[in-house]
C-alpha cells in the first residue's frame, strides 16, 4: 500500500495528509 504520500494517508481527491512534519 505504498504511494506518493506513504506512509501518510491520502484522501480520495489525491490530497496528501502529511502527519509527520519532519518530512517538510
Swiss-Prot record:
- Source organism's superkingdom? Eukaryota
Membrane-topology descriptor:
Peripheral membrane protein
Looking at the keywords, is Secreted present? yes
Major localisation: membrane
Give the record's keywords alphabetically. Answer: Angiogenesis, Cell adhesion, Cytoplasmic vesicle, Fertilization, Membrane, Secreted
Cellular localization per UniProt: Membrane; Secreted; Cytoplasmic vesicle, Secretory vesicle, Acrosome membrane
Q: Which GO terms describe its biological process?
A: angiogenesis; cell adhesion; single fertilization
Gene Ontology CC, one term: extracellular region
Record flagged with keyword Oxidoreductase: no
Q: What does this protein do?
A: Specific ligand for the alpha-v/beta-3 and alpha-v/beta-5 receptors. Also binds to phosphatidylserine-enriched cell surfaces in a receptor-independent manner. Zona pellucida-binding protein which may play a role in gamete interaction. Contributes to phagocytic removal of apoptotic cells in many tissues. Plays an important role in the maintenance of intestinal epithelial homeostasis and the promotion of mucosal healing. Promotes VEGF-dependent neovascularization.
Question: Could you identify this protein by its name?
Answer: Lactadherin
Organism of this sequence: Equus asinus (Donkey)
The taxonomic lineage of its organism, from the top, reads: Eukaryota, Metazoa, Chordata, Craniata, Vertebrata
